[in-house]
Amino acid sequence: MKKVNTAAFALSIATLSAMVQAEPTSQAFVPTELSSKSAQGEANGFFEDQHLTGTTRNWYANELARRDTSFSYRKGGDTPTPTSRRINWVQGTIVDYTSGFTQGTVGFSTELALYNAIALDRDRKDMAGGSNRTLTENDGDAVGQWSKMGLANVKARISNTTLTGGRQSVNTPVIAYIGNRALPSSFNGFALKSDEFNNLSFQAGSFDRVSPRTEQSLTKFRSEYASTTAFADRIDMAGVDYKPFESLTTSFYASNVEDFWHQYYFAFTHELGDTDVLGLSTNLNYYKTKDAGQRKLGPIDNDTYSLSFTATHQAHSLTLAYQEVEGDEYFDYAHETNAIFLANSLLSDFNGPNEKSLQIGYVLNMAEYGVPGLKFNVYQARGWGIDGTHYKGTAYDVKSMDGESHYEYGVGTSYTVQDGPLKATAVRATYTTHRASEFQADGSLNEFRLVTTIAFNIL
């Protein structure tokens, strides 16, 4: 029987290998060469290439706290009143004007975007204190309608290299806008993006303020997870993205959050096989974070990585992801950014001190069944071994965490309109459950979200 089982297992492995190698993704080496085209050389003019576009997003979230978790609101005066329910409903609209680049060796362009938010649910108890979902006054009342200049920048371009100055959207592993609310965040500063080579790009930037998702003003940078109120005046970053093979992409970035930490990031994604038969995608993300400067957050020495495998057969994708934090503090990143390019960053980030986590997820793409744009997904993730008892600092409230654990599961569906006047309109519904042990920071709750984003073109 043992020989039969061994033979069957060997046959299964051989069959799987054959399927993966059927019509495989090219593994060919990609030599680095200067780009054959110049983006600036194709510029048509400031007004000739101008665009006026926008989106309007209806963002609804309904949370129910469970176990020992609760929200609070000000029923009267300054005394907080606990409640188990939190509801936020906001309409966020963006109108974005982008000019074309002027012609010549050096081209110039500008971008201006007006952000507007309307609180559709203004009940003080429903909002349960506001936070980063609905903008509120100091007394807890909703700000019914507010606007701000979300983007305002000028660009200068030579060939395929662009320098941007002003308020802008940035998306890198060490500083990235976060767009999971009615409106996204943005940053004030300078950024350089160079695509002079066919398989090698370079980015660098320096930013001194963030425009939060649910605030009208600009603020300094602060930590996402520190319990102290410390601010950083600047984030500097640089990085490269390199594609040495047709099937392999790599990234390396470094950043300095002034007087907080130095952070280094490395990643690769490798593609194998053919998704019509069986494709395999492997993704590694690694962050190294070390305290720096005045060490406003105290000692930090953190190594965090995630490794994920996604097998895809036509409409079906199955993902297995492992993530681990090696450090006595959280894996941390700047507040109002999405600089956590890790596989198990879900409703919870699964980034507690010394935490290990495992996720399994499934996605069904209905395009294979004649309904392009429709997708379903389901996942479950578990984190364990959270231990902050050896933490030597005071910035992170982790010393009571000793063997903490938690789990999360979610289901979701999304649909994106493929053509017609509502092309690119997207609707997404998700239901997520999170349960935590006593001192795990995220608590226990259920959340339902319904987000509808309608895109429109004016000019």
Per-range role (PLM):
Residues 48, 87-93, 146-150, 184-188, ...:
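Residues that define the transmembrane beta-barrel architecture of outer-membrane proteins
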Residues 322-323, 327-404, 408-411, 416-418:
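C-terminal structural cap/anchor segments
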Residues 203-226, 235, 277-357, 437-443:
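Outer-membrane beta-barrel translocator/channel fold
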Residues 52, 105-108, 160-164, 199-203, ...:
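Repeated loop/turn-to-beta-strand initiation elements of outer-membrane beta-barrel proteins
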Residues 21-167, 364, 412-418, 426-459:
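Beta-barrel outer-membrane channel/assembly domains of diderm bacteria
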Residues 58, 163-177, 202-204, 238, ...:
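Transmembrane beta-strand segments that form the barrel wall of outer-membrane beta-barrel proteins
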Residues 54, 93-99, 152-156, 190-194, ...:
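Residues on the lipid-exposed face of transmembrane beta-strands in outer-membrane beta-barrel proteins
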Residues 98-131, 138-219, 240-247, 319-330:
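Outer membrane beta-barrel
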